[in-house]
């Protein structure tokens, strides 16, 4: 079952990536058992929100506004939701990488991560400098500097009130 908050956040993803992101969200979510649901905690982030996160303590990002793939709608961060009392409310949000709520002997986080990686998503868990397990991105081979330069030069599309680089 889809998480409405996640579906709304996917609508803010880069238009070129939106359909893939939705399809892969549903594919990953379908691998989770009853009582577990995948949520995207972030998809698109404005530069001002990015700066706020950058200045937060403890440190949660190395990227200032404009320096994150999130700022271009090409990334998402995940969190797993658990319905501990089986009433459909999913009262626990978790970043646990070991919990196996559906008792299939594979950690729920691993099931989701393995699926996204199999679909071509880069995972922040594999980074060497700033390891970021909840982060996934599909950047079409562009780094943030190139994406920012496109926006700065007006090579853009605007949709839903959000400006994205043309890619």
Locations of the language-model features?
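Cell-envelope/glycan interface and biosynthesis
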Residues: 1-143, 147, 160-161, 166
């Amino acid at each position: 079952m889809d998480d409405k908050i996640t579906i709304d956040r996917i609508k803010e993803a880069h238009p070129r990536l939106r359909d893939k992101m939705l399809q892969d969200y549903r594919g990953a979510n379908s691998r989770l058992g009853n009582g577990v649901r995948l949520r995207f905690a972030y998809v698109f982030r404005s530069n001002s929100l990015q700066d706020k996160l950058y200045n937060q303590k403890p440190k949660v990002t190395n990227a200032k506004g404009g320096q994150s793939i999130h700022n271009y709608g090409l990334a998402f961060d995940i969190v797993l939701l658990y319905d501990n009392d089986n009433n459909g409310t999913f009262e626990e949000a978790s970043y646990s990488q070991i919990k196996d709520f559906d008792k299939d002997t594979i950690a729920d986080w691993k099931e989701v991560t393995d699926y996204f990686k199999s679909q071509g998503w880069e995972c922040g868990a594999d980074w060497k400098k700033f390891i970021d397990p909840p982060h996934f991105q599909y950047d079409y081979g562009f780094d943030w500097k190139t994406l920012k330069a496109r926006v700065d030069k007006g090579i853009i599309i605007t949709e839903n009130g959000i400006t994205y680089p043309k890619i």
